[in-house]
């Protein structure tokens, strides 16, 4: 059997950090994610408050917009970089270095 990763407890916090670090409103973040046809813009607020969990496709878009590897979003032991690299250009591999959280929440 495969290993099931526990639900990330810091995901909502990290999604909000990304939007704020990029200086975007929730509506602008919705557009930047390219999610107009997948979700309503009001879902961004629900993701950031932890009331809803984004789909894999939306998580991939958040990682792309922020320029970080998706693992930085879903692994509670990893922090986002202090400065987000920004969107990854097509064909470019860009993995942001992340630091292990000193305050593990377990």
Stretches found by the model and what they are:
Residues 14, 43-46, 72:
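Residue-level recognition of specific faces of alpha-helices
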Residues 2-5, 64, 74-106:
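Short, charged recognition helix plus adjacent turn
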Residues 22-46:
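Short alpha-helical DNA-recognition segment
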Residues 41-42, 49-64, 80:
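Short, basic-rich loop-to-helix N-cap that marks the start of a DNA-contacting helix
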Residues 29, 58-63, 73-74:
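Hydrophobic micro-packing sites on short alpha-helices
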Residues 1-22:
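A short, Lys/Arg-rich alpha-helix, primarily the initiator
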Residues 13, 23-24, 39, 54-57:
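Residue-level signal for the short linker/turn that defines the boundary of a DNA-recognition helix
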Residues 20, 34-35, 49-51, 78:
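Residue-level detection of the helix-turn-helix DNA-binding "recognition helix"
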